[in-house]
Amino acid sequence: MRRLLVLIVSFFALSCCFCSGQGGEVKVLYWNIQNGMWHDQGNNYDNFVAYVRDLDPDICVWVEAESRYITDKAVKMQMPEDQYLPWNWDLLAARYGHSYTLVCGKRDTFPQVITSKYPLKIVKRVNGNGSDIIVAHGAGWAVVQLPGGEELNVVTLHTWPQKFAYLAEDEKADAAAHGGDRFRAREMQFICEQTIGTDPAAKDRLWLMTGDFNAISSVDNFHYRKSLDDTAFLVHDYVRGNTPYIDVIEKFYPGEFQKTTVSGKRIDMVYVTPALFDKVVSASVLREGFADCYRDPRGKDIHNFCHPSDHFPVFFTFKP
């Protein structure tokens, strides 16, 4: 009898390891943390860790997840040993309760990292085709093993940010021709073709695509008031017209603009397939407390860096 009791207790203890928050919900936090959370690196990331622990997400997607600048300066780190991230994400994630860490997309010094309470694995890193397509910062496709056995496909990305195309010979002329918008659109098409485009049943499966798209959406044009054929909309027009993805924030806040950057744009998106959207119970852009971003008063002297980031986090929950 005693042995049976021990086995029952052990079973429930093991089950709790796979419990997904209150009421069985899975909480997902996305954030572009600007230069590897440069703001808090001199503080051993204590404020950052405390903020994440308070939110208690089950899955995190971090963009710009690499240390790049010396604390409180706009001076780039020169030696890899000076960079705490991305090499030590496992140690940092453990401080807010995550046991699994993956560098999902990385082609340069602006990687995307996933951390999770649940097992995860890389499926594909998307950097280009070696010919005429380059994904400047890289993108990635990972799978998270959810409680109960379901798989969540996670696509992370950070598209090219400039007005001119990557490697443009005449940057000024290319910017005038909207080369940056067109380059981002090619990146987006290639990323989708290499990820969700490989799954004929994607709309019936759990897919999430999130990141810094560096592009605004025509669904927010009630705010931007641009011509609908403006090249600024090319990236999200492609997603909306060629994939089953649903813009979560748009659906939860119809007609209500939700900025995700200090500059006042919404360029950080959470896209999910219909199968996942049906399970989403809440979604929001976080702009209070530690996430209340502002520009460093030193301005251009410090590259217009912000504290703690120039982007706001996006948080959503779903029930598997």
Region roles according to the model:
Residues 6-16:
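Bacterial N-terminal signal peptides
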Residues 32-34, 66, 158-160, 213-216, ...:
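Catalytic metal-binding/acid-base residues of hydrolase active sites
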Residues 151-153, 179-214:
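His/acidic metal-ligating clusters that form di-metal
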Residues 25-38, 124-126, 151-161, 177:
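Active-site-proximal beta-strand elements of phosphoester/diester hydrolases
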Residues 3, 18-95, 107-109, 310, ...:
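N-terminal, active-site-proximal structural segment of metallo-dependent hydrolase catalytic domains
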Residues 63-162:
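Structured beta-strand-rich core segments of catalytic domains in phosphoester-bond hydrolases
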Residues 164-182:
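A solvent-exposed, charged loop/short amphipathic helix patch at secondary-structure junctions
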Residues 197-208, 214-320:
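Metal-dependent phosphoester-hydrolase catalytic domains
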